[in-house]
């Protein structure tokens, strides 16, 4: 089993992560992990802080001579924008955890809350997910994401319906990670407009896991279902308010005959011509791509603040402003990729086990051979 913990505050000295359960002898490609961190920092609509920070990991343990040892991997990412003694937040922001967190932990204001609830913490999650991606790519499993909507602007249905795996490598060409050039222009305009008006924008992310083997997850108990684990991990990303798999919410208005993926058999075994289920049935991966969409709300920190109440005076006032993004949807898509990577890596280790990568690979290959006999 793979598990992790993170620690650190947004304006503290740095972030700390501990990742346990990665088998020994996995090549640690530091450039790959640092590139994942760089991808998270990019995107139109980010705050000035992205020009300050240059996220790179420092490995303290669990790696020797570029290979994992099987011991817990401890990671540090330093903060350059450090100032933990910033002014107290007594004017809580609607939509953020300032008020509820301060009341729960008996703080005078929301400073201690926002320092930890900040999306800055997701930098460490991306580093951890990056290591999980290294494990997955050894089994030819890859994870992609792209943006299908920001604000009211959606990519065209024609382009969306014709996206293939080769297209998914091209999202880096877009500053907002969309595969529709016309939509990209409109999105950039909407982000500029929101910034000018002191407002923020949300959107919809699509994340796709490819070459997923049959049999990850389980139908035997509620807490072992793969889609449940994925939903939990994606919903834990700051600002994410909903998730769907495959056709998702649109299935509510369709007939069963229009929704379920018919099963066929050919030279390569069982297959489906459609993937309306999004690659998971009864909590188990079915061999198709895993396709999920997540909805991100607009960021709650506004330059034109909403009404709130001062926690000291109890008088009506305007919410406090902190340096923040106008739109973080492109960045959130990278976080979502790496959260999916964590879940899938955990499931791979759970199913194919082994203390070393070599042992895990043998178990995986034996499983594929067994499946071939059933084809």
Residues covered by each model-derived region:
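Generic N-terminal targeting/processing segments that precede catalytic cores or assembly contacts
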Residues: 1-375
């Amino acid at each position: 089993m793979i598990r992790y913990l993170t620690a650190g505050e947004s304006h503290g000295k740095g972030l700390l992560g501990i990742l346990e359960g990665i088998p020994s002898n996995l090549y640690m490609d530091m450039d790959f992990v640092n590139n994942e961190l760089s991808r998270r920092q990019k995107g139109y609509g980010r705050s000035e802080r992205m020009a300050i920070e240059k996220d790179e990991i420092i490995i303290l343990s669990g790696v020797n001579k570029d290979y994992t040892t099987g011991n817990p991997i401890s990671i540090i990412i330093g903060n350059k924008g450090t100032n933990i003694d910033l002014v107290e937040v007594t004017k809580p922001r609607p939509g953020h955890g300032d008020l509820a967190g301060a009341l729960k932990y008996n703080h005078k204001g929301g400073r201690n809350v926002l320092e930890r609830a900040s999306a800055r913490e997701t930098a460490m999650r991306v580093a951890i997910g990056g290591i999980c991606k290294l494990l997955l790519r050894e089994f030819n499993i890859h994870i992609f994401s792209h943006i299908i909507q920001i604000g009211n602007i959606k990519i065209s249905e024609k382009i969306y319906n014709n996206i293939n795996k080769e297209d998914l490598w091209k999202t880096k060409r877009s500053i907002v990670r969309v595969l529709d050039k016309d939509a990209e222009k409109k999105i950039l305009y909407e982000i500029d407009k929101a910034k000018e008006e002191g407002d923020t924008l949300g959107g919809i992310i699509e994340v796709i896991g490819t070459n997923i083997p049959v049999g990850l997850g389980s139908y035997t108990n509620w807490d072992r279902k793969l889609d449940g684990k994925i939903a939990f991990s994606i919903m834990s990303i700051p600002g994410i308010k909903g998730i769907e798999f495959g056709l998702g919410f649109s299935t509510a208005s369709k007939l069963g005959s229009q929704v379920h993926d018919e099963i066929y058999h050919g030279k390569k075994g069982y297959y489906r011509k459609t993937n309306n289920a999004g690659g998971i049935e009864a909590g188990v991966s079915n061999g198709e791509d895993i396709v999920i969409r997540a909805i991100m709300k607009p960021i709650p920190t506004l330059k034109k603040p909403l009404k709130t109440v001062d926690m000291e005076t109890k008088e009506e006032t305007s919410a406090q402003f902190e340096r923040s993004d106008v739109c973080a949807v492109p960045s959130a898509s990278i976080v979502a990729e790496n959260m999916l990577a964590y879940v899938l890596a955990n499931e791979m280790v759970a199913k194919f086990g082994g203390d070393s990568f070599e042992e895990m690979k043998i178990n995986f290959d034996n499983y594929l051979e067994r499946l071939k006999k059933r084809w």
